[in-house]
């Protein structure tokens, strides 16, 4: 059901930034109120990222009001906060399709709109890309401006500081807006600071500042006195020393929910030369009390009733794989004080809340710093501790060199608990866990396991933790398990699979949680089904036995076919000279868009019907 835009009379006048810029400045507070209410009503009907967008309503309105988008380039970091941006850039009537199959993309996406300058989803990329755009604009010479919006979490990543360090060195015209929603708006963010921000960003001050530098450049004592005076004025009210040292002119912090102050400050800053940083203070979940109170729970939400302020509880009582991991972590830590668990800012998503509370001295949240997380684990292992890195598949990509250089080459006993392996669903191309088996399988010394259910996941985590001959990865999916009952811990034999169903002619070698679909397909085909368990080392003896006693081998995995587990089987068969038909089923050579996990699996032929259909095509074509 579409939302009646007539209930939002000011928002109705601003379907795109050109129309927004025609509104009188005095109407902007009213526009913000309506935009926030529209966002609430839309996301409550469709699901999606919520709290971040509520916090950036005023900023989004001010940016599109002042800057000449899409001529000026606006770069959003991560993109969770960009729903208001989508609503104001011609996508208002489709916002209720966001994160759905064939709907709006969950993040800014270049193919979707000319207002989306960078495809995002992972954090801390905005300043690097924005710097490139700023240099291109500078050489173009048409007066195009570049603005990057980055949050206080994302700016902690090394890549953001690398970009700022570079920007400070080459001195482009670029504005970085630090959206700081970690603190409440304090007395530092009041009338004095708002006034000072407008003063320091104004043309009179900057003209005097630059003119004074030129006049007194040959009088070092006076030049130094002026510099210290300016630093003292800023230092009384702003924490900008770090950014100034990186070569940025720092303004703020100011109230990110005062749209009129934001608009005037941005208008001033658009005229400034060189690297600029505007620090704004916002509140995640602004304007909706439940989200303000608990922004983590309201970060991404299912459909909900906005009048009750209560998120619906899942009717599925089966534990998620993330919970399986978190509970196992607590069980293992109860018997081993040398266990150290590390997460790069994904405590809730990785199922580590309970562990962080019960074992705070053994828990490390290193922030958005995947590279550091992995090498930090290497240091712990060298020091005699037993580190576990809990990380999403898509984010492990960001620490690939550290896995090789700092872990595998030194053959250190580090356990990687890789969550969200395979199809993740609604977050689309940037978040599917499509590549981990491929990029880990080629690394020497690495042991890789893929459980078929939640009990096997527990056993593999236990096995990997107690395997001290080198690094181990246990890779499991997003979502709930099959309902398998947990069994007492046992260490699995390394590199050994298990036959789950004996059949004829066709053998399905399954890697991971597609096993139930494989068994369902096998019933109709009278096929053998093997739970391979290990991607590396492969159970060579079992694979060769299957090849010798079946006409067709089928490999099944929720990973890219290229370089994945199936490729490993192909390599073994070629190496051993076995001439047998083989069919690799997995993720195709394309980036998989958003949709529900069930929809995507069906589209890619990874459900029972699709598996059966692919096998029949091979058998009878």
Curated annotation (Swiss-Prot):
Keyword Magnesium: yes
Entry-linked CDD domains: TPP_DXS, TPP_PYR_DXS_TK_like
Cysteines engaged in disulfide bonds, as pairs: none
Classification via SUPFAM superfamilies: Thiamin diphosphate-binding fold (THDP-binding), TK C-terminal domain-like
Organism annotation: Photorhabdus laumondii subsp. laumondii (strain DSM 15139 / CIP 105565 / TT01) (Photorhabdus luminescens subsp. laumondii)
Cofactor: Mg(2+); thiamine diphosphate
Binding locations of thiamine diphosphate: 80, 121-123, 153-154, 181, 288, 370
A Pfam family it matches: Transketolase_C
Associated pathway: Metabolic intermediate biosynthesis; 1-deoxy-D-xylulose 5-phosphate biosynthesis; 1-deoxy-D-xylulose 5-phosphate from D-glyceraldehyde 3-phosphate and pyruvate: step 1/1
BP terms from Gene Ontology: 1-deoxy-D-xylulose 5-phosphate biosynthetic process; isopentenyl diphosphate biosynthetic process, methylerythritol 4-phosphate pathway; terpenoid biosynthetic process; thiamine biosynthetic process
InterPro entries documented for this protein: Dxylulose-5-P_synthase (IPR005477), THDP-binding (IPR029061), Transketo_C/PFOR_II (IPR009014), Transketolase-like_Pyr-bd (IPR005475), Transketolase_BS (IPR020826), Transketolase_C (IPR033248), Transketolase_CS (IPR049557)
Name of the molecule in the record: 1-deoxy-D-xylulose-5-phosphate synthase
Family classification: Belongs to the transketolase family. DXPS subfamily.
Binding-site positions, Mg(2+): 152, 181
Top-level taxon of origin: Bacteria
Keyword Metal-binding belongs to the record: yes
Summary of subunit composition and partner proteins: Homodimer.
